[in-house]
Amino acid sequence: IYEVLEPDDRQPGWRNRSYLAKYDLKTGLLQPLTFGYHNVWAADISNDGRYLLMMTSQSRLTKRPTTLFSLYRLDMQTLQAELLIDKDGFISGARFSPDGTQVLVSGSPESLGGIGKNVKEGQTPSMTDGQLYLLNIADKRVTPLTKDFNPSVQRAVWNKADGQIYFTAENRDCYSLYRMNPADGKIQQLEVSEDLVNSFSLAQNAPVM
């Protein structure tokens, strides 16, 4: 007799779970950080190495969305975990601000209670429309950064050198490159010769891309 929890439970390896561990490059010691029946993965590490953003997932087949994600901040010194976002099926990632006091959250318009929705009442926004949100860790206040920005955000990086957020977005038939000031939310498209900017990399201590 076998208990099948959900359709995917028939697939080999479905019950395998991922966990996080800290590896000390100096001593070679490996310290497990998480354990349990939920998959856990790292979203980002603060610049000072003190905090870790980690996400977990769990299934909920009775209603949309069927997969829920939670976001935690783990103190690497005390191993205390702080819940930042609980069971949100529409977030997809998170990154620390350069000073570690804020979190840049990516997801669809329905993320975080639908604060990023920009459609008529009764309409459901596209789950593939990428949006950015700013979460203040101290008071958990969330600000939608791209609610009135039409292109769909793909990949975003918060630059340490100038404090600006750089991201690519699906702009009609192009993948364009943009820069955002997180202080006022102003977005500027960067003029580059390529129509399809698939990836980019930033220097941490210099204004170089």
What residue ranges belong to the model's regions?
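Residue-level detector of Asp-centered blade-edge/turn motifs that repeat once per structural unit
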Residues: 47-48, 98-99, 160-161, 203-205
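Hydrophobic beta-strand positions that form the internal "hydrophobic ladder"
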Residues: 52, 103, 164-165, 207-209
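Thioester-forming pentapeptide GCGEQ
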Residues: 16-30
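Serine-hydrolase catalytic core recognition
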Residues: 162, 196-209
